[in-house]
Amino acid sequence: MNESFDKDFSNHTPMMQQYLKLKAQHPEILLFYRMGDFYELFYDDAKRASQLLDISLTKRGASAGEPIPMAGIPHHAVENYLAKLVNQGESVAICEQIGDPATSKGPVERKVVRIVTPGTISDEALLQERQDNLLAAIWQDGKGYGYATLDISSGRFRLSEPADRETMAAELQRTNPAELLYAEDFAEMALIEGRRGLRRRPLWEFEIDTARQQLNLQFGTRDLVGFGVENASRGLCAAGCLLQYVKDTQRTSLPHIRSITMERQQDSIIMDAATRRNLEITQNLAGGVENTLAAVLDCTVTPMGSRMLKRWLHMPVRNTNILRERQQTIGALQDTVSELQPVLRQVGDLERILARLALRTARPRDLARMRHAFQQLPELHAQLETVDSAPVQALRKKMGDFAELRDLLERAIIDAPPVLVRDGGVIAPGYHEELDEWRALADGATDYLDRLEIRERERTGLDTLKVGYNAVHGYYIQISRGQSHLAPINYVRRQTLKNAERYIIPELKEYEDKVLTSKGKALALEKQLYDELFDLLLPHLADLQQSANALAELDVLVNLAERAWTLNYTCPTFTDKPGIRITEGRHPVVEQVLNEPFIANPLNLSPQRRMLIITGPNMGGKSTYMRQTALIALLAYIGSYVPAQNVEIGPIDRIFTRVGAADDLASGRSTFMVEMTETANILHNATENSLVLMDEIGRGTSTYDGLSLAWACAENLANKIKALTLFATHYFELTQLPEKMEGVANVHLDALEHGDTIAFMHSVQDGAASKSYGLAVAALAGVPKEVIKRARQKLRELESISPNAAATQVDGTQMSLLAAPEETSPAVEALENLDPDSLTPRQALEWIYRLKSLV
């Protein structure tokens, strides 16, 4: 059956009518329909779930004359199945029984109590603990884009207004949302197609007036001026849709979402999608996390610290006051790393626990972990009290103390609580007198049954008599079959077994009712007390969130202090003068994976030396040298120490990389097209304060075309844009650029060749390389010897041609490839319009004289 929810359900059974009405409210997502100890799925949902979860597809009777496809999962294992579905981009509506089966006439009342989507999950079983899980919304109008992100597991709410497609693509790549909401008339589908968790939303959800109203209601404000977003209309359209979606799916208040922040381009160093990919900040080129900058730098001891560090890496700040404060804190903490990290490790993921507290989905073990985090605060305060640093003391103040809340949780929650409050045994003995009384009554059953058994044996003289309990029949007195005929007259038969009879007596029945009542009342009271704990904790939510943020930042800074000490990093100096000066710089990732010592190299970029033409052999280290420069700059601008002996760095507004490329087959773009698209982005957007890495521009086309393009790009970057540029090339003709342009210098990475072997020195030297060593590298790669021999012969032939001919052509006539088309001469235009077959001999002679006059 294809589900169609606009028709009459009357020919279905009452239970299926209830299901179909609920399903009609959530037609596009899976519905988990609670039936006893299982969540059931029916019809198309069952078919989809059986494929996605690899569970059995069965049939359940018939409704409306048709068998019903059905699949089910045990309720106690639901989180595991939800995790699988969420990881595949699916959303699920959870439908629970809310009525009492004992009093219900017809199907038990049910309703959808929550909707689980990839971008709105907060349960720790469904989340990657060291990675942000973002819900995002995108909006577009004629002036640009609006973009909003929310991490519901922390309450972090951000918006931005990317001006163009490239900036928007970079934001999507940086934030990598788990779920992306877009308007039904969104024009740039090519920008988002293929992304996970795409959700098409109606236009009215993006209306600006509705958005302002929603946000003011959420924050309890009259306007949004205090958040600095009042005039960000495109961003607010996206934020309004996002907030509406969260309210629709969570179906509860969201007290932990207390503010919204505008992210402005001018506040951070801008990196486009290609740059983030090429620098392998948190993901390597193969899509993994090994051998990335984060893999080397992230030794944080809390999940929330790890997530904050990754946010810093993807959004380096330009405010040098913030950066110097971080540097000072790192320096001040270096002597206390070994004492602080073990204590911080015990804090855990307080940030996400607080989000679950706000959503009222926190479990008993969440509260136990919160208590454990509070118990670490006195030790952290004591250790930080002696650190002579204003930023450290500011962090210490934000951490707070929460002694009263710690005392509350120590009194209220047992040391090792069960997973769920419905299991009972969560509230500690002594916390509530009435609960202790009900528990004592329930727990005293064993003593009573022992006494009853002894008394009845003595009274009846039956030595096989014993008292017991099972979940189906309750309490009973059991007598063997051989003695059952001696049972007293007041014994009422309850159950017959193969070798025994079971009885009940009024006294035991009365006690059974009392015990079962006490257990039920104890569980109900325990649930009530647990809910009251939320009411006692939530008024402190704002201070608790501030504390969690301070603890995460402390973890990041202590981690950076440890990394600086362990990896021999130095504190960079910021200057207002443009340029980058590095002494003995190292690649932070490559030096960790090498078995031999890394060869450190210097770098000097300044207004007088703003472009380096880098030549040298393949595998000589050109790309490593370029990337290490960008990574050192990136680390400096998150406030970290850097892998070098000394670094002085001026203002940087953007980092661009045009390093390596691959075919973009999905978009129908060749390697060369990808390369040129990235190059065009750099030439349009780079400024004199940008750091630009250009590697092997011009590959993938003919030699002269490639050389001409490389020459023109270098010329544009050096003379017009004046960006700080590292330009690696195998076109040796480009080494003549320093003679023709100011601010350009040659450097090279050397190698030693001996016979058929080659040794790479990996050391950067001034001047151009003497040769490429391409044949030696080919031999090293295992190219057959006869091919290498023939290549040497051909090389000698080509080298017999004047080596400067190509450069002369590129500098002169060949550059016309990139110049504007020349105007067509009048003589040529006249000839193009001439029809020679229609001319008489006299007219032909006249045309000769006319053309002569036009030349």
Curated annotation (Swiss-Prot):
Pfam family, any one: MutS_II
Question: Biological process GO annotation list?
Answer: mismatch repair
Task: List the GO cellular component terms.
Answer: cytosol
Query: SMART domains under this entry?
Result: MUTSac, MUTSd
Q: Which residues bind ATP?
A: 616-623
Determine the domain of life of the protein's source.
Bacteria
Report the GO molecular function annotations: ATP binding; ATP-dependent DNA damage sensor activity; damaged DNA binding; mismatched DNA binding
| SUPFAM superfamilies in alphabetical order | DNA repair protein MutS, domain I (SSF55271), DNA repair protein MutS, domain II (SSF53150), DNA repair protein MutS, domain III (SSF48334), P-loop containing nucleoside triphosphate hydrolases (SSF52540)
Q: Does the keyword Translocase apply?
A: no
Entry keyword set: ATP-binding, DNA damage, DNA repair, DNA-binding, Nucleotide-binding
Q: Does the keyword DNA damage apply?
A: yes
Briefly, what is this protein's role?
Answer: This protein is involved in the repair of mismatches in DNA. It is possible that it carries out the mismatch recognition step. This protein has a weak ATPase activity.
- Identify its protein family: Belongs to the DNA mismatch repair MutS family.
Q: Which PANTHER family match?
A: DNA MISMATCH REPAIR PROTEIN MSH1, MITOCHONDRIAL, DNA MISMATCH REPAIR PROTEIN MUTS FAMILY MEMBER
Protein name, as recorded: DNA mismatch repair protein MutS
Species of provenance? Salmonella newport (strain SL254)
